[in-house]
Amino acid sequence: MRMNTARLVLIMGLLATSPAFAVDHQVKMVDEGAEGNMIFEPGFLNAKAGDTVTFVVKDPGHNVISRHVPPGADSWKGTVSQGFTVTLTKEGVYLYECDLHKMLGMVAVIQVGKPVNLEAAKAAAAALSKKMAMGAERLDEYMGKIR
């Protein structure tokens, strides 16, 4: 009886770490939020490979476009005023933006597992910050959360 219980516990543990238990994270695209105007909420997301991110339109007139992804990861581009879901398949740092409001600082960061492309992501963030009229400090703050 104890052997069957031990096997059951082992099997349950293995199943709990499988991709079948991936999380769907929700990121809102908003005109005005807790961290300012023209933002993604949350602006920094920590996820695992296999998780999905669903970008939810709370205020129309926004889209989501990846600007930097880890090696081997697919880039993405959503349609203006429409929700969008992406599956995060590779570990690393992902930078994304609203194409219409990036100049206003509508950018955000996702870390998936280990930040294997951290130096390249930092360089991409620095280049992106130079093109922003406002909100660059937001991107710096999000990049500072990477561990």
Label each region the model flagged.
Residues 17-18:
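N-terminal signal peptide c-region/cleavage motif recognized by signal peptidases
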Residues 21-147:
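Extracytoplasmic copper-binding redox domains, predominantly the cupredoxin/blue-copper superfamily
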Residues 1-9:
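Bacterial N-terminal signal peptides that target proteins for export
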